[in-house]
Amino acid sequence: MARYRHSRSRXRSRYRRRRRXRSRYRSXRRRYRGRRRRRSRRGRRRRGYSRXRYSRRRRRRY
């Protein structure tokens, strides 16, 4: 079983490498743009949520 598993992963990695390679330049740009937009939105939302939360806790404690 262990031997089979190892060979399977090898293979798999080989297939992945070929594919990456090939569409790395094409999706590179698209991936970067999507990531940047998502990150900025998430950061803003997270900050507001945590703030809030923090201020609420402080009020309750006092």
From Swiss-Prot:
Residues 1-62 are annotated as: Disordered. One of its GO terms (molecular function) is DNA binding. Keywords: Chromosome, Developmental protein, Differentiation, DNA condensation, DNA-binding, Nucleosome core, Nucleus, Spermatogenesis. The keyword Plastid does not apply. One of its GO terms (cellular component) is nucleus. Testis. Coiled coil: none annotated. It is found in: Nucleus; Chromosome. The keyword DNA-binding applies. PROSITE patterns: PROTAMINE_P1. Belongs to the protamine P1 family. Protamines substitute for histones in the chromatin of sperm during the haploid phase of spermatogenesis. They compact sperm DNA into a highly condensed, stable and inactive complex. This is Sperm protamine P1. It comes from Dendrolagus dorianus (Doria's tree-kangaroo).
